Amino acid sequence: MDLTIQPHKLSGTVTVPPSKSLAHRAVICAALSDGTCKIDNIALSDDIIATIEAMKAFGAIIEQEGSALTITGAGQYVTEAKVAESATTAEHLIDCNESGSTLRFVVPISTLFQGASRFV
């Protein structure tokens, strides 16, 4: 049997139990997209707040309402930076708030964006 998978845009809803590990990944994926995502049932620990603030520093717009986040991603900045010589070279100040998970995720992500990143 041959199976062909055709690429399509994704849309829909996924509900997962609150998990700090999954929350880091969900926030980062949404923040790197070039669309808007809503994530419900987020447990806002200090580590997750550090990841949220880091993604904001790269240009994502993140709004909180209760345990839900609406994230407009900064993915367009990554694409534009790769094709535009005049992309911003502003320094990104990232305060990981002593979150090892945030630091481990965000250091490699910082290489996607123009300009230096300083981690404190």
Regions of interest found by a model, annotated:
Residues 1-120:
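Short, structured segments at the rim of ligand-binding sites
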